[in-house]
């Protein structure tokens, strides 16, 4: 695959607008109006480096021992075959040669971790980030790959001479590392397989319903902790295996600390200014040898997310979040013997998985109109240059306009979000607004969970608010534990009111500017964003249509569907799982007790794994003769992972908002039944009594 040759470190800025043509060659400006639009089909096929849920510290990339090459995994969805294609890619860090696909294949490997006392949680739907491991000589990669449901270790030649499995066991391999060019250490949990087999045997007599069950994700007991990790060493030449020594285990378990670095005899780390306050600012601390720690008092030393030491130059480099509501990322350079950092780069986009290579960082980078790609960032000048773009063709499409919004909400909290407008938007035109939640850092794809296609919605004529949830009021207060803070946030749904008020403040701001029609506002959400949808429809009159990816926020879902283990844990965090829907806690969020006073058309696009939790609220709305539709996608999880389903969700979301906010329909014959149902819902709505106004 060829790497991108487009020299476009970032989009062109005109005031606060990011132009749709920021990454087009100059010769393309004349033809921009003829460029094709970004459709759901285009969006769903964009290739991804790593996983959709990557953070600044997610290890997306792997540098070769000599620093000349970088390896990473690329995933691309195909909605026609309903498959995700995985490629292991090697790219020269100097950009001189094209990237090489050293392996193509494998199945979608779900990200699962121990949580809530379960040995392995139910898949969220996000894929596991696969970080390949370089052999000491730099000739091969070792990495995890799943085929036919089994996770094995594969080895690939970095010259593209072939790849094959080298470690297979009766259990899934969970981690791997080289000890030398011919020896690998790997880990897994054979006890998990044994525990699953015991559950299968128990099923012959019938399972006792107990704390092992999580009904929302299945009717089968889950394996509980603890399950021991086993470490094995494989000799690739002889094929012999043995138990790993403690020293070898330490080699595998050792992971770099993103918030710790050495420069000479000075150790740099990050600590809170008040160790007893979980919300106290974090700041840089330097300790020379065995001396006393010295705290950096500069504002630039706070909110650090990554750091690297350069002993040759006697310099520390670090990334931090800064600016209004921490909406920017910045890179700083600081002499090791003087706590005076100097900023050398900043932007509103994202840098993820950065690795230092001599005087450069190699990072995965994305911005509002730029999907994730690889870039180099010069540690002296701050100049960013593209290294590898898995989606070079996106630049030929006609992209919407993006404006970064900043305001202080009615609670005094700094907020940022992004306004996305159609490519041909004319100033002064009022558009229907669709709100997509609840993170707006990086590429504006589909919001959290990637279900609400921002660019195609804008292309369809909507203004789109890519909403970034504000910090909670409680996060500015002193708490000694997350549980204590959570209880404060759930008290009277304090944080949910803060989110809803922020949404209303942004709607009012866009209304004052004449950008939107406040009578035609749609709201979407997944996970925590879905809770905001439920809360917003009950407690506000601002929303004319809504789409949610899960449902509902009520006593049944929190207590019954979460099972005894999780429901008990949720209660400790301030969620009243033992209170009925008509009690004071759930009255603000439950459709069951509020159905008669709602009137907003609601589309629920649920995974089959979660739809049972939607039935009480959905049924209450149906019985109250309210406009609601429930779509269930088979073999899906909290985040939908199948390309065909993602495309269907994209298209149905656009159709729903076009129908309710624009009074438009798609004439495609295969959608006739859909619109028959929706016209029946509209007729039902017109016959229903007026809803009770929100408080």
UniProtKB/Swiss-Prot annotation:
EC number: 3.4.-.-
Subcellular location as annotated: Cytoplasm
CC annotations in GO: cytoplasm
Effect of residue 527 to A: Loss of activity
Pfam families: Peptidase_S9
Enzyme kind, highest EC tier: hydrolase
Secretion signal, residue range per the UniProt entry: 1-30
Classification via PANTHER family: DIPEPTIDYL-PEPTIDASE 5, SERINE PEPTIDASE S9 FAMILY MEMBER
Official protein name in the record: Lasso peptide isopeptidase AtxE2
Lineage: Bacteria, Pseudomonadati, Pseudomonadota, Alphaproteobacteria, Caulobacterales
């Amino acid at each position: 695959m060829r790497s991108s040759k487009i020299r476009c470190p970032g989009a062109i800025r005109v005031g606060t607008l990011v132009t749709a043509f920021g990454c087009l060659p100059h010769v393309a400006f004349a033809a921009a109006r003829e460029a094709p639009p970004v459709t759901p089909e285009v969006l769903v096929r964009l290739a991804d480096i790593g996983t959709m849920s990557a953070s600044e510290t997610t290890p997306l990339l792997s540098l070769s021992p000599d620093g000349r090459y970088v390896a990473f995994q690329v995933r691309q969805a195909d909605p026609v075959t309903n498959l995700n294609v995985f490629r292991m890619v090697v790219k020269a860090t100097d950009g001189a040669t094209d990237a090489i696909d050293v392996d193509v294949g494998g199945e979608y490997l779900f990200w699962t971790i121990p949580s809530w006392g379960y040995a392995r949680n139910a898949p969220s739907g996000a894929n596991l980030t696969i970080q390949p491991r370089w052999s000491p000589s730099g000739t091969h990669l070792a990495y995890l790959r799943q085929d036919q449901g089994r996770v094995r270790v594969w080895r690939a030649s970095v010259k593209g001479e072939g790849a094959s499995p080298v470690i297979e066991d009766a259990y899934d391999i969970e981690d791997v590392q080289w000890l030398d060019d011919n020896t690998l250490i790997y880990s897994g949990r054979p006890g998990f397989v044994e525990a699953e087999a015991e559950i299968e045997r128990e099923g012959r007599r019938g399972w006792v319903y107990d704390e092992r069950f999580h009904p929302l994700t299945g009717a089968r007991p889950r394996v509980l902790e603890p399950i021991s990790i086993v470490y094995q060493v494989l000799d690739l030449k002889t094929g012999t295996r043995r138990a790993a020594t403690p020293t070898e285990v330490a080699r595998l378990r050792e992971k770099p600390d993103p918030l710790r670095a050495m420069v000479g005899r000075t150790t740099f780390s990050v600590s809170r200014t008040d160790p007893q306050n979980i919300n106290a600012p974090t700041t840089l601390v330097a300790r020379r040898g065995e001396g006393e720690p010295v705290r950096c008092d500069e504002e630039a030393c706070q909110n650090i997310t990554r750091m690297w030491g350069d002993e040759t130059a006697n310099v520390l480099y670090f990334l931090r979040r800064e600016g209004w509501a921490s909406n920017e990322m910045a890179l700083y350079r600081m002499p090791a013997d003087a706590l005076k950092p100097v900023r050398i780069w900043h932007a509103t986009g994202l840098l993820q998985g950065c690795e230092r290579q001599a005087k450069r960082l190699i990072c995965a980078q994305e911005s509002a109109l730029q999907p994730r790609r690889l870039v180099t960032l010069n540690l002296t000048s701050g100049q960013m240059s593209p290294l590898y773009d898995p989606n070079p063709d996106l630049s030929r499409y006609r992209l919407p306009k993006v404006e970064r919004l900043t305001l202080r909400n009615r609670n005094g909290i700094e907020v940022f979000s992004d306004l996305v407008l159609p490519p041909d938007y004319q100033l002064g035109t009022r558009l229907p607004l669709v709100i997509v939640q609840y993170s707006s850092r990086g590429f504006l794809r589909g919001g959290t969970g990637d279900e609400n296609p921002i660019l195609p919605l804008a292309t369809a004529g909507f203004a789109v608010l890519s909403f970034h949830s504000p910090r909670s009021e409680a996060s500015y207060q002193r708490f000694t534990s997350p549980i204590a803070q959570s209880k404060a946030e759930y008290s009277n749904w304090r944080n949910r009111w803060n989110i809803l008020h922020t949404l209303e403040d942004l709607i009012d701001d866009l209304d004052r500017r004449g950008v939107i029609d406040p009578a035609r506002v749609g709201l979407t959400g997944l996970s925590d964003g879905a809770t905001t949808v439920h809360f917003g429809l009950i407690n506000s009159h601002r929303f004319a249509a809504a789409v949610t990816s899960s449902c509902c926020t009520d006593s049944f879902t929190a207590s019954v569907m979460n099972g005894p283990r999780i429901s008990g844990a949720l209660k400790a965090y301030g969620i009243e799982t033992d209170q009925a829907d008509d009690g004071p806690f759930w009255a603000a969020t439950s459709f069951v007790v509020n159905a008669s006073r709602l009137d907003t058309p609601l589309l629920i696009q649920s995974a089959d794994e979660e739809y049972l939790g939607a039935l009480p609220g959905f049924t209450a709305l149906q019985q109250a003769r309210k406009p609601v539709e429930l779509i269930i996608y088979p073999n899906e999880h909290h985040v939908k992972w199948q390309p065909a389903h993602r495309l269907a969700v994209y298209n149905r979301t656009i159709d729903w908002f076009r129908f309710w906010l624009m009074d438009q329909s798609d004439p495609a014959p295969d959608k006739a039944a859909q619109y028959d149902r929706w016209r029946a819902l509209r007729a039902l709505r017109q016959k229903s009594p007026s809803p009770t106004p929100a408080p």
